[in-house]
């Protein structure tokens, strides 16, 4: 049975039917508690975590006759071993996969000693979002991003908002077949300035993400990646050639949290953040702050010191509010005071741009000049951007340079 797709970001939830039509339903505002009863009332089936070694775009029908092939595409970033074994090198798991088997992400399959991507061009969800929803606050404020996702992930986060995408096998989801050129055409048609690879983990569809970004550039549309940062150096360096920005979920400073709550490791994510800095790719960090699990002030301090020491004070950091979801429905919503305290800790240690997220209307969602303290990018409810007091990447009040991607 094919599954419904749930796309969750802050206040919006989109329920995508597994058939050819789609519908959207709106959850109560995040200021209200979302009960399990309300969640189940949306008609979304549950998905189990299994770890083993046509939609509409901006109101337009997305055609599947895009010239894209239904034949699985050979993966990049792997090596052939003896006895028809292969080793995938797209992420730090470096899965060794036997003939007929799949890697941890369940999107890469060994067929007779050749590794294939099962999700190349298989778009399981697409939507047009404000770039602030990703969130990117220093990338083309107020712009739109044509957002795409496939099945699969190389983590199994217990709090995943989009678990029905990330924890599903490709064959369990209804998807449409799109070529990179078709993705670009849909981005243009929707009025989007960007293509965003998001919702699930783009690392598992690195080949498609790269090709979409390259095709987009040829038409003047740039791409951004929304990722957990669990990616090896070679694919990251390849992506850096064609993307405008990369958002990393800095899920915690605790190694234990990574191991027990995400199923991954912390240090490879830290290496990705440092590597992005060296590659010159604009990077923003997001910390989903979960009560009792990663809201320890000592960890905030360690995170702040690491950021200052390794990537510097200019990287934006977003502390976003957790809402009970997936396997962590027993936990409460994050108190706003916790997010504010985290923001204070990082700013006290010299990080210039620290944001409070998932709290619509909070002043901590706006951008303030580190020179004069004035509000230079005003943000309100629903990802809206108000007045922008900047000129050519500088503060309109005092002239100090504000780091970011302000034009392309």
Feature roles, as predicted:
Residues 188-215, 257-270, 287-302, 308:
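Conserved glycine-rich "GG(E/T)P / GGGxP" loop and the immediately following alpha-helix
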Residues 16, 21-30, 59-87, 93-149, ...:
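N-terminal [4Fe-4S]-dependent radical SAM core
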Residues 88, 157, 369, 395-398:
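Short cysteine-rich clusters marking metal-coordination/redox-active sites
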Residues 22-47:
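N-terminal secretory signal peptides and thylakoid transit peptides that target proteins
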Residues 166-167, 202-204, 229-236, 246-263, ...:
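Conserved radical SAM core fold
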Residues 267-328, 339-355:
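Conserved C-terminal portion of the radical SAM core fold
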Residues 110-245:
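Conserved Radical SAM active-site core
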Residues 382-390:
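Short linker/helix segments within small regulatory modules
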